[in-house]
Swiss-Prot record:
This is FAD synthase. InterPro entries: Archaeal_FAD_synthase (IPR050385), Cyt_trans-like (IPR004821), FAD_synth_RibL (IPR024902), Rossmann-like_a/b/a_fold (IPR014729). NCBIfam families: cyt_tran_rel. Gene3D superfamilies: HUPs. It catalyses: FMN + ATP + H(+) = FAD + diphosphate. One of its GO terms (biological process) is FAD biosynthetic process. Alkylation of both Cys-126 and Cys-143 results in complete loss of enzymatic activity. The gene is ribL. Changing residue 143 to S: Nearly no change in activity with Mg(2+) but loss of activity with Co(2+) as cofactor. Divalent metal cations. The best activity is observed with Co(2+), where the activity is 4 and 2.5 times greater than that with Mg(2+) and Mn(2+), respectively. Homodimer. Pathway: Cofactor biosynthesis; FAD biosynthesis; FAD from FMN: step 1/1. The keyword ATP-binding applies.
């Protein structure tokens, strides 16, 4: 039986850190499904809308080699896609703080789901390993007039 792995994230301004977590997640199983956060959800969590619209982020993530399928998250219940997908493994990113591993296990157990939950510890092999760092660098260069519009 195929081992299904699920991970989730915003994936706004793709960078090597995103690719590394997806490669890691895929290495744990046979099928990788990625849940891409909805624009409205990102705004609630981060206080700002993503730069890239949700459907475009979903398409970009799905185009990446490790990913078998990318879907948009639920606007009602963040656990809904996980309950539908019934993964064997859930991979959490290093900066995902909505759930810690134990809380997520307890929540899913209420629905008789017992996936292995793995925390990806991060990727910092390049200077731009986060979308926020990329945005900060663009602003820095623009303010220093290194970028002309």
């Amino acid at each position: 039986m195929k081992k299904r792995v699920v991970t989730a994230g915003t994936f706004d301004i793709l960078h090597p850190g995103h690719y590394e977590i997806l490669k890691f997640a895929k290495s744990l199983g046979d099928e990788l499904i990625v849940i891409v956060a909805r624009d409205e959800t990102v705004k609630k969590l981060k206080g700002r809308k993503p730069i890239i619209p949700e459907e475009q982020r979903r398409e970009m993530v799905e185009a990446l080699k490790p990913v078998d399928k990318a879907i948009l998250g639920s606007l009602k219940n963040k656990l809904e896609p996980i309950l539908e997908l019934k993964p064997d493994i859930i991979v959490l990113g290093p900066d995902q703080t909505t759930f810690d591993e134990e809380t997520l296990k307890k929540e899913l157990a209420k629905y008789n789901l017992y996936p292995e939950i793995v925390r990806f510890r991060g990727y910092k092999k390049c200077p731009f390993h986060s979308s926020f760092d990329i945005v900060k660098e663009i602003i820095r260069r623009f303010c220093n007039k290194e970028i002309k519009i």
